[in-house]
Amino acid sequence: MELTIFILRLAIYILTFPLYLLNFLGLWSWICKKWFPYFLVRFTVIYNEQMASKKRELFSNLQEFAGPSGKLSLLEVGCGTGANFKFYPPGCRVTCIDPNPNFEKFLIKSIAENRHLQFERFVVAAGENMHQVADGSVDVVVCTLVLCSVKNQERILREVCRVLRPGGAFYFMEHVAAECSTWNYFWQQVLDPAWHLLFDGCNLTRESWKALERASFSKLKLQHIQAPLSWELVRPHIYGYAVK
């Protein structure tokens, strides 16, 4: 099986060699950062349509974590185009963080379409180093389709715990590796290197639930599901929330 995976990966490498050459020359990262927001703004429309019920379920109790003022302070890490905004409760104070500055113009459009929120600021930073956000300063942190592409899951989860107030919550929805015995997992392994390059560092075979289980949360509510998505490769999902 490993030999078959190697041969198929080699074939895909040959087919996508121009991308690897651009990456070797240091050009692909710049191109990817430019085009990825345009891809994501279209992908998230489809994703939100197919995952709307799960997102509404996930975010249904957000307001329960509001601070004494009654207003919810929310930090979204890897905010992308602002696809989650419509699921947040009215009056929610939202800060966004993303390492790609090219998302900002799409965020501005999303903010204009979601007047029920109080937008605070957009910070260009990686989730592994959110030094611009003070310790214990937010009620809720949200990550959706982010843990698949971060460079260090343990570090970003430590940062999440740092910025959350005691009793605050971390909400997540992530595609993950399929069960090892399935054909889906086989094709995830075959396509993972090319997928990682093409989709801005995204990984198909991450077992993100393990990092969440190891993190220093006092409570973890996590579910595994087969998401109702068109792309079978990303149907295996986890979603839920963890309390600091």
UniProtKB/Swiss-Prot annotation:
Activity control mechanisms: Inhibited by 2,3-dichloro-alpha-methylbenzylamine (DCMB).
What is a single cellular component term in the Gene Ontology annotation? endoplasmic reticulum
**Do you know which InterPro entries this protein is assigned to?**
Methyltransf_11, SAM-dependent_MTases_sf, Thiol_S-MT
Which of UniProt's keywords are assigned here?
Answer: Cytoplasm, Endoplasmic reticulum, Host-virus interaction, Lipid droplet, Membrane, Methylation, Methyltransferase, Microsome, Signal, Transferase
Enzyme class, broadest EC rank: transferase
Q: Report the domain of life of the source organism.
A: Eukaryota
- Give the induction text: Silenced by miR-6807-5p.
Outline the segment boundaries, as ranges, of region: Targeting to lipid droplets.
1-28
Where is this gene product found? Lipid droplet; Endoplasmic reticulum; Membrane; Microsome
Does the entry feature the keyword Lyase, yes or no?
A: no
Q: State the post-translational modifications.
A: Methylated at lysine residues most likely by EZH2.
> What is its biological role?
Thiol S-methyltransferase that catalyzes the transfer of a methyl group from S-adenosyl-L-methionine to alkyl and phenolic thiol-containing acceptor substrates. Together with TMT1B accounts for most of S-thiol methylation activity in the endoplasmic reticulum of hepatocytes. Able to methylate the N6 position of adenosine residues in long non-coding RNAs (lncRNAs). May facilitate lncRNAs transfer into exosomes at the tumor-stroma interface. Promotes osteogenic and odontogenic differentiation by regulating the expression of genes involved in stem cell differentiation and survival.
Q: Record's family?
A: Belongs to the methyltransferase superfamily.
What binding partners and quaternary form does the record give? (Microbial infection) Interacts with HCV non-structural protein 4B/NS4B (via C-terminal region); this interaction may promote the recruitment of NS4B in the proximity of lipid droplet.
What name does the UniProt record give this protein?
Thiol S-methyltransferase TMT1A
- Organism encoding this protein: Homo sapiens
